[in-house]
């Protein structure tokens, strides 16, 4: 296995956000990390990427290298991470934000330009980052991660599709699939289970800080099990997973 997590525990102060997670994944795959709010999804992937600020125990190895003991710079050479909320304090253009990849690992202008094209942000490149919409900002920081990322590396995405319209989601999903096809391992936190079903090869299901299930998409994304875990009824139509929306109209005042 390319990525091996052994007995991972993560704390927020005195509270355990992740408890004893052991799981693995191969390169060339897309792994969706799912679960309800507060289940430990983001804490887990941040710990894997080495950016979680709290205390953590256990080990993470990537291609045989112990990431738990690696320096931030060494880790960044093999692991690129995108947070769910883009934060750029300086007054940069989108192109300058993407070029920040060169502050982590040596990168040429060609790396930056390829990332710009891969995420379809050339029309945004010279605009102020702060003036972009939420979905546009997310695509720009994803392009920065792609500029930093070496094919065959580990890419960790925490809810990357938030604030994106359908066309933006489609563009990013296509880029993620291309990276996996080229040998990268992509971990992606998702709330949209239909998107997880369409995009991922494997699924890690977090529940109350523990790994409830992991394995191939078709076995973990079982409609009956998801209904019990999420409190929402699911069904498969033509092989695709979708939630069943049942109207609940409470009496209105007056």
Predicted features, each with a name:
Residues 227-254:
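ABC ATPase nucleotide-binding domains
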Residues 155-159:
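Catalytic Walker B motif of ABC-type/P-loop ATPase nucleotide-binding domains
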Residues 49:
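Helix-to-loop junction immediately C-terminal to a conserved catalytic motif
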Residues 66-80, 85:
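ABC ATPase NBD coupling module
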Residues 56-66:
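Conserved ABC transporter NBD signature motif
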Residues 34-36:
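The feature captures the beta-strand-to-loop junction immediately N-terminal to the Walker
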């Amino acid at each position: 296995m390319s990525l091996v997590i052994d007995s991972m525990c993560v704390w927020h102060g005195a509270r355990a956000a992740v408890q004893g997670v052991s799981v693995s994944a191969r390169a060339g795959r897309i792994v969706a990390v799912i679960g309800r709010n507060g289940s430990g999804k983001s804490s887990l992937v941040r710990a894997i990427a080495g950016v979680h600020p709290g205390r953590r125990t256990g080990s993470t190895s990537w291609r045989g290298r112990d990431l738990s003991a690696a320096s931030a710079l060494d880790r960044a050479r093999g692991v690129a991470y995108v947070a769910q909320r883009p934060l750029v304090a300086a007054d940069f253009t989108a192109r300058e934000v993407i070029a920040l990849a060169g502050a982590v690992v040596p990168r040429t202008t060609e790396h930056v330009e390829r990332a710009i094209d891969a995420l379809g942000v050339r029309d945004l490149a010279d605009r102020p980052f702060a003036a972009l919409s939420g979905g546009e900002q997310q695509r720009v920081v994803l392009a920065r991660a792609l500029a930093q990322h070496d094919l065959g590396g580990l890419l960790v995405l925490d809810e990357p599709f938030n604030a994106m319209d359908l066309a933006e989601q489609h563009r990013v999903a296509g880029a993620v699939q291309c990276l996996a096809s080229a040998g990268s391992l992509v971990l992606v936190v998702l709330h949209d289970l239909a998107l997880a079903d369409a995009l991922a090869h494997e699924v890690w299901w977090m529940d109350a800080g523990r790994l409830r299930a992991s394995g191939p998409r078709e076995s973990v994304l079982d409609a009956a099990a998801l209904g019990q875990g999420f409190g929402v009824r699911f069904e498969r139509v033509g092989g695709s997973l979708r939630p069943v929306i049942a109207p609940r109209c409470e009496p209105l005042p007056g």
